[in-house]
Structures are given as structure tokens and as C-alpha cells.
């Protein structure tokens, strides 16, 4: 019976130790979301993937380290439309 209590205590300590980093990550994510302005119709898209898995020339003309955004209603001057984004049940222009 003592062994069961000790194992349960160790399990609870381990679960609590894992929960604290999760809470810290949740707090960081909440703080990051609060910093995003809601009145701006611009959405920043950040993508990361393994370069070896990406199809070559999947988007002609798109270069590495190019800043791309989903915009409504159209791209800004100097940007080119490369496709479409679907966000918040709306269609946005994918501009780089």
C-alpha cells in the first residue's frame, strides 16, 4: 500500500512538473496574441518546413527570405500576387 502511495505521489509530481512549462507556453502565446492589432486588415503568414521536402519551383518567381502576406482586397504597390489565402471565412490575396 505504501508503494502505491509513493508511486502516486511521484506521478503527481511528474505531471505537475510537465504542467508548469505548458502554462508558461500558454502565457507566452496569449501575450503574443494580445500584441496583434485587430484593426489592421493585414495578416502575416510565417511558414517553416524542411527544404528537402518542398517541391522545387512550386511557386515560380518566389525567392528565399521573401516577405509574403495575405491581404484584402489586393496587393500593395511593389508586391505581386502569388495565390490565395483563406482566413476567417474570407478570401485574401497572397502577396509577396
Swiss-Prot record:
Matches recorded under InterPro entries: Alpha-defensin, Alpha-defensin_C, Alpha-defensin_N, Beta/alpha-defensin_C
GO CC term, one of those recorded: extracellular space
A Pfam family it matches: Defensin_propep
Disulfide cysteine pairs (residue numbers): 68-96, 70-85, 75-95
Taxonomic classification: Eukaryota, Metazoa, Chordata, Craniata, Vertebrata
Main location per the UniProt record: secreted
GO biological process: antibacterial humoral response; antimicrobial humoral immune response mediated by antimicrobial peptide; cellular response to lipopolysaccharide; defense response to fungus; defense response to Gram-negative bacterium; defense response to Gram-positive bacterium; disruption of plasma membrane integrity in another organism; innate immune response in mucosa
Propeptide cleavage-removed residue intervals: 20-66
SUPFAM superfamilies referenced in this protein's UniProt entry, alphabetically: Defensin-like (SSF57392)
The keyword Signal is annotated on this UniProt entry: yes
The name this protein goes by in its record: Neutrophil defensin 8
Function of the protein: Probable antibiotic and antifungal activity.
Recorded family membership: Belongs to the alpha-defensin family.
Signal peptide start and end residues: 1-19
Keyword Secreted (UniProt): yes
Classification via PANTHER family: ALPHA-DEFENSIN 1 (PTHR11876), NEUTROPHIL DEFENSIN 1-RELATED (PTHR11876:SF19)
Localization terms from the record: Secreted
Keyword terms: Antibiotic, Antimicrobial, Defensin, Disulfide bond, Fungicide, Secreted, Signal
